[in-house]
């Protein structure tokens, strides 16, 4: 008799689990969820704490970066901190470099299927930017397991046009 009672769970009844919708990953999605205009969004930078300007909000989504959620508080990354973070990651976590189309041999994937971000501003490179790097035999760098190159805007800083 004692063993039969010991096997039964004694405690509070199971509570129904509340399923919460996923938190938005972009500032545009956040604005839509809150039903406010994009230019009314006040999102602080995760690193410096300054609120992103409207231009930085647009750049953040254009770069295909994701919002950071900490205990239901949202953070993004401003332009200056994006550049600083990209530089830090490159300097601390650099792994290797390939030139132009060699990236396809190393990864075993088509250039169109390889995710590449700008090593300077963290923008997600489009197909034209990746093909430009391949065609001009410029470098792709493997940094922290992700491929980096130079986007069309940042290549002007390097006088590489």
Swiss-Prot record:
GO biological process assignments: DNA-templated transcription; regulation of DNA-templated transcription; symbiont-mediated perturbation of host apoptosis; symbiont-mediated perturbation of host ubiquitin-like protein modification; symbiont-mediated suppression of host innate immune response; symbiont-mediated suppression of host type I interferon-mediated signaling pathway
Highest rank taxon of the organism: Viruses
The keyword Transmembrane belongs to this UniProt entry's keyword annotation: no
GO cellular component terms attached to this protein's record: host cell cytoplasm; host cell nucleus
Pfam families: E6
Keyword Transcription regulation included in the entry's annotation: yes
Compartment annotation: Host cytoplasm; Host nucleus
Single GO molecular function: DNA binding
Keywords: Activator, DNA-binding, Early protein, Host cytoplasm, Host nucleus, Host-virus interaction, Inhibition of host innate immune response by virus, Metal-binding, Modulation of host cell apoptosis by virus, Transcription, Transcription regulation, Viral immunoevasion, Zinc, Zinc-finger
Classification via InterPro entries: E6, E6_sf
Alphabetical list of Gene3D superfamilies matching this protein: E6 early regulatory protein (3.30.240.40)
Zinc finger (unnamed): 45-81, 118-154
SUPFAM superfamilies: E6 C-terminal domain-like (SSF161229)
Broad class of the protein's primary localization: host cell
HAMAP family: HPV_E6
Function: Plays a major role in the induction and maintenance of cellular transformation. E6 associates with host UBE3A/E6-AP ubiquitin-protein ligase and modulates its activity. Protects host keratinocytes from apoptosis by mediating the degradation of host BAK1. May also inhibit host immune response.
Self-association state and partner proteins as the record states: Forms homodimers. Interacts with ubiquitin-protein ligase UBE3A/E6-AP; this interaction stimulates UBE3A ubiquitin activity. Interacts with host BAK1.
Homology family: Belongs to the papillomaviridae E6 protein family.
Protein name per Swiss-Prot or TrEMBL: Protein E6
Protein species of origin: Human papillomavirus 25
Gene: E6
């Amino acid at each position: 008799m004692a063993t039969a009672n010991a096997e039964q769970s004694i405690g509070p009844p199971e509570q129904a689990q509340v399923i919460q919708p996923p938190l938005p990953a972009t500032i545009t999605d956040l604005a839509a969820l809150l039903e406010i205009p994009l230019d009314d969004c006040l999102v602080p930078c995760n690193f410096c704490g300054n609120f992103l300007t409207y231009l930085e909000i647009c750049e953040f989504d254009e770069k295909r970066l994701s919002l950071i959620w900490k205990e239901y508080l949202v953070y993004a990354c401003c332009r200056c901190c994006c550049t600083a973070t990209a530089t830090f990651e490159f300097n601390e976590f650099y792994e290797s470099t390939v030139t132009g189309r060699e990236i396809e041999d190393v990864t075993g994937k088509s250039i169109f299927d390889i995710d590449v971000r700008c090593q300077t501003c963290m923008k997600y490179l489009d197909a034209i930017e990746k093909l430009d790097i391949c065609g001009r035999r410029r470098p792709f760098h493997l940094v922290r397991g992700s491929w980096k190159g130079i986007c069309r805007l940042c290549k002007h800083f390097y006088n590489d046009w």
